[in-house]
């Protein structure tokens, strides 16, 4: 990566290992000399000031909490109820402050070579009653790092997501194929990887493909 690069990280679904994959990619880029930080732009299911995903990122990246974590820049919006952002914000009776999120992301981009912004759930998760995560990705103009896996059904979910990404003109920066957690059917997992790789080569020839191992 050259200069200040911001990427939004999202996936086919929740519980697909986004946080694990985000930390892996950040660790990889840091090892390659690209100073990278992660951000969870909307965290739900946590008390004020705490983000379990950012804590996981730092642990897997081999880092202590960073000053930007303490300043709230890596976790600008936190809601207590474990639900999609539109519902969590309604339950907490507080609207999502998108200006606060944007400012935090911009500050991080000034301090680091790359910022990986982790989404909440999948691309079609509602952030508000009128806006989905994919709307935020499109409006921000940031390239997308997309996480999929080899579990049964992921080909369908992945290709539907690819069609939505292509239709909206979003730049697909990287596709991460997550082998974590272990326990998936190895035959299905191998075939899914081959199928998705061929699809990317045909439809997104400039997109990188990264395999995320079980660490």
Question: Where are the language model's segments positioned?
Answer:
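Short, small-residue-biased leader/transition segments that mark boundaries at the very start
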Residues: 1-8
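N-terminal phosphate/diphosphate-binding loop that engages ATP/GTP or pyrophosphate donors
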Residues: 20-93
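Hydrophobic "anchor" residues on beta-strands that sit immediately upstream
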Residues: 36, 114, 174
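Beta-strand-loop-alpha "switch" segments that mediate conformational coupling across diverse proteins
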Residues: 197-215
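Conserved catalytic-core segment of NTP-binding enzymes
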Residues: 107, 119-203
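Glycine-rich phosphate-binding P-loop
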Residues: 9-22
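Phosphate-binding/switch loop-helix module in NTP-utilizing enzymes
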Residues: 82-127
């Amino acid at each position: 990566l050259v200069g200040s690069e911001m990427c939004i990280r999202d996936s086919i679904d929740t519980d697909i290992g986004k946080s694990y994959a985000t930390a892996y990619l950040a660790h990889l880029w840091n090892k390659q000399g690209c100073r990278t930080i992660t951000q969870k732009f909307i965290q739900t299911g946590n008390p004020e000031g705490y983000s379990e995903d950012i804590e996981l990122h730092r642990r897997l990246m081999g880092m202590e909490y960073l000053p930007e974590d303490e300043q709230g820049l890596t976790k600008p919006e936190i809601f207590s109820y474990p639900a999609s952002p539109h519902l969590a914000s309604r339950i907490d009776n507080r609207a999502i402050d998108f200006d606060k999120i944007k400012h935090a992301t911009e500050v991080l981009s000034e301090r680091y070579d790359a910022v990986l912004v982790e989404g909440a759930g999948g691309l079609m998760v509602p952030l508000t009653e009128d806006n989905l995560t994919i709307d935020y990705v499109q409006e921000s103009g940031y390239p997308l790092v997309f996480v999929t896996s080899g579990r049964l059904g992921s080909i369908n979910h992945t290709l539907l997501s690819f069609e939505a990404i292509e239709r909206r003109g979003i730049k697909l920066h990287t596709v991460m194929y997550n082998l974590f957690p272990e326990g998936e059917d190895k035959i299905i997992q191998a075939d899914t990887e081959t199928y998705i790789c061929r699809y990317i080569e045909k439809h997104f020839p400039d997109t990188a493909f990264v395999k995320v191992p079980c660490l």
